[in-house]
Protein backbone atom coordinates (compact mmCIF):
# COMPACT_ATOMS: atom_id res chain seq x y z
CA UNK A 1 0.00 0.00 0.00
CA UNK A 2 2.85 2.33 0.76
CA UNK A 3 4.21 2.04 -2.81
CA UNK A 4 0.83 2.99 -4.26
CA UNK A 5 0.64 6.05 -1.99
CA UNK A 6 4.10 7.19 -3.06
CA UNK A 7 3.25 6.67 -6.75
CA UNK A 8 0.02 8.68 -6.57
CA UNK A 9 1.73 11.46 -4.59
CA UNK A 10 4.54 11.66 -7.14
CA UNK A 11 2.07 11.61 -10.03
CA UNK A 12 0.00 14.37 -8.41
CA UNK A 13 3.11 16.47 -7.81
CA UNK A 14 4.24 15.99 -11.42
CA UNK A 15 0.77 16.92 -12.76
CA UNK A 16 0.60 20.08 -10.63
CA UNK A 17 4.11 21.05 -11.72
CA UNK A 18 3.26 20.61 -15.41
CA UNK A 19 0.03 22.58 -15.08
CA UNK A 20 1.75 25.40 -13.21
CA UNK A 21 4.52 25.69 -15.81
CA UNK A 22 2.01 25.61 -18.65
CA UNK A 23 -0.17 28.33 -17.15
CA UNK A 24 2.77 30.64 -16.44
CA UNK A 25 4.15 30.23 -19.95
CA UNK A 26 0.76 30.95 -21.52
CA UNK A 27 0.29 34.13 -19.52
CA UNK A 28 3.76 35.46 -20.34
CA UNK A 29 3.33 35.09 -24.10
CA UNK A 30 -0.16 36.56 -24.28
CA UNK A 31 -0.74 40.26 -24.91
CA UNK A 32 -3.70 41.72 -23.07
CA UNK A 33 -6.19 43.52 -25.34
CA UNK A 34 -6.82 47.17 -24.49
CA UNK A 35 -10.41 48.22 -23.74
CA UNK A 36 -10.01 51.69 -25.27
CA UNK A 37 -7.58 53.38 -27.63
CA UNK A 38 -7.77 57.18 -28.03
CA UNK A 39 -6.89 59.42 -30.96
CA UNK A 40 -7.51 63.04 -30.06
CA UNK A 41 -7.34 66.09 -32.35
CA UNK A 42 -7.48 69.49 -30.63
CA UNK A 43 -6.14 72.79 -32.03
CA UNK A 44 -3.44 74.00 -29.66
CA UNK A 45 -3.42 77.79 -30.30
CA UNK A 46 -6.69 79.27 -31.61
CA UNK A 47 -7.45 83.00 -31.52
CA UNK A 48 -9.63 84.52 -28.81
CA UNK A 49 -13.39 83.98 -29.46
CA UNK A 50 -12.56 81.44 -32.16
CA UNK A 51 -14.67 78.32 -32.56
CA UNK A 52 -12.67 75.17 -31.81
CA UNK A 53 -13.46 71.83 -33.45
CA UNK A 54 -12.27 68.85 -31.47
CA UNK A 55 -12.51 65.17 -32.44
CA UNK A 56 -11.95 62.01 -30.44
CA UNK A 57 -11.68 58.65 -32.20
CA UNK A 58 -12.27 55.64 -29.97
CA UNK A 59 -11.65 52.00 -30.72
CA UNK A 60 -11.29 48.78 -28.74
CA UNK A 61 -9.13 45.69 -29.02
CA UNK A 62 -11.81 43.61 -27.31
CA UNK A 63 -13.74 41.11 -29.41
CA UNK A 64 -16.94 42.30 -27.74
CA UNK A 65 -18.53 45.74 -28.03
CA UNK A 66 -18.46 48.41 -25.30
CA UNK A 67 -20.95 51.17 -24.48
CA UNK A 68 -19.03 54.40 -23.81
CA UNK A 69 -20.14 57.78 -22.54
CA UNK A 70 -17.77 60.64 -23.40
CA UNK A 71 -17.82 64.20 -22.10
CA UNK A 72 -15.60 67.19 -21.34
CA UNK A 73 -15.07 68.87 -17.97
CA UNK A 74 -13.28 72.08 -16.99
CA UNK A 75 -13.03 74.47 -14.04
CA UNK A 76 -13.65 77.28 -16.54
CA UNK A 77 -17.28 77.56 -17.71
CA UNK A 78 -17.65 76.96 -21.46
CA UNK A 79 -20.93 77.29 -23.37
CA UNK A 80 -22.31 75.32 -26.28
CA UNK A 81 -21.13 71.95 -27.54
CA UNK A 82 -18.50 71.67 -24.82
CA UNK A 83 -21.23 70.40 -22.48
CA UNK A 84 -22.58 67.61 -24.70
CA UNK A 85 -22.47 64.06 -23.34
CA UNK A 86 -22.14 61.51 -26.13
CA UNK A 87 -22.99 57.81 -25.77
CA UNK A 88 -21.89 55.29 -28.42
CA UNK A 89 -21.32 51.61 -29.06
CA UNK A 90 -17.63 50.85 -29.78
CA UNK A 91 -16.74 47.57 -31.49
CA UNK A 92 -13.31 46.29 -32.57
CA UNK A 93 -14.16 46.38 -36.27
CA UNK A 94 -15.76 49.83 -36.17
CA UNK A 95 -13.91 52.79 -34.56
CA UNK A 96 -16.15 55.73 -33.71
CA UNK A 97 -15.31 59.44 -33.89
CA UNK A 98 -16.97 61.96 -31.57
CA UNK A 99 -16.99 65.71 -32.21
CA UNK A 100 -17.29 68.79 -30.00
CA UNK A 101 -17.40 72.41 -31.16
CA UNK A 102 -17.02 75.28 -28.71
CA UNK A 103 -15.76 78.88 -28.52
CA UNK A 104 -12.66 79.69 -26.47
CA UNK A 105 -12.41 83.11 -24.86
CA UNK A 106 -9.29 82.38 -22.81
CA UNK A 107 -6.68 79.67 -22.36
CA UNK A 108 -8.61 76.56 -21.39
CA UNK A 109 -7.49 73.39 -19.62
CA UNK A 110 -10.02 70.59 -19.75
CA UNK A 111 -10.37 66.86 -19.26
CA UNK A 112 -11.81 64.41 -21.78
CA UNK A 113 -13.66 61.72 -19.81
CA UNK A 114 -14.71 58.37 -21.26
CA UNK A 115 -16.73 55.99 -19.08
CA UNK A 116 -17.56 52.43 -20.08
CA UNK A 117 -21.17 52.04 -18.95
CA UNK A 118 -23.99 49.48 -18.88
CA UNK A 119 -26.58 51.56 -20.78
CA UNK A 120 -29.13 49.57 -22.74
CA UNK A 121 -30.38 50.33 -26.24
CA UNK A 122 -26.98 51.47 -27.53
CA UNK A 123 -25.26 48.32 -28.85
CA UNK A 124 -27.05 45.79 -31.10
CA UNK A 125 -29.13 43.29 -29.11
CA UNK A 126 -27.86 44.99 -25.91
CA UNK A 127 -24.69 42.86 -26.11
CA UNK A 128 -21.72 44.72 -24.58
CA UNK A 129 -19.11 44.18 -21.87
CA UNK A 130 -17.64 46.25 -19.04
CA UNK A 131 -14.02 45.37 -18.15
CA UNK A 132 -13.22 44.38 -14.58
CA UNK A 133 -9.91 46.28 -14.63
CA UNK A 134 -11.44 49.75 -14.98
CA UNK A 135 -14.26 51.60 -16.62
CA UNK A 136 -13.08 55.24 -16.58
CA UNK A 137 -10.43 56.74 -18.86
CA UNK A 138 -9.36 60.36 -19.20
CA UNK A 139 -6.74 62.67 -20.61
CA UNK A 140 -6.08 66.37 -19.98
CA UNK A 141 -5.50 69.01 -22.64
CA UNK A 142 -4.84 72.75 -22.73
CA UNK A 143 -5.87 75.08 -25.54
CA UNK A 144 -3.72 78.23 -25.44
CA UNK A 145 -5.52 81.32 -26.78
CA UNK A 146 -3.44 83.74 -28.90
From Swiss-Prot:
Similarity comment: family membership: Belongs to the PIP family.
InterPro entries: Ig-like_fold, Ig_E-set, PIP
Residues spanning the signal sequence: 1-26
Paired cysteines (S-S): 65-91, 89-123
Lineage of origin: Eukaryota, Metazoa, Chordata, Craniata, Vertebrata
UniProtKB keywords: Disulfide bond, Glycoprotein, Pyrrolidone carboxylic acid, Secreted, Signal
Location in or out of the cell: Secreted
Sites carrying sugar chains: 29
Modified residues (Pyrrolidone carboxylic acid): 27
SUPFAM superfamilies assigned to the protein according to its UniProt record, in alphabetical order: E set domains
Domain of life: Eukaryota
A single GO cellular-component term on record: nucleus
Any GO BP annotation: proteolysis
UniProt key word Secreted: yes
PANTHER family per record: PROLACTIN-INDUCIBLE PROTEIN, PROLACTIN-INDUCIBLE PROTEIN/SEMINAL VESICLE ANTIGEN
GO molecular function, one term: IgG binding
Location, primary (coarse class): secreted
Pfam families the record matches: SVA
Protein name (Swiss-Prot/TrEMBL): Prolactin-inducible protein homolog
Assembly: Monomer. Interacts with AZGP1.
Amino acid sequence: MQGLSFTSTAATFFLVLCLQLGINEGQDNETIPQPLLFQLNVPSTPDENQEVDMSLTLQTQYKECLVVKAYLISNTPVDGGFNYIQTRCICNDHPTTLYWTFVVTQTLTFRIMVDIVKDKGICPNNVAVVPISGNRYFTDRTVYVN
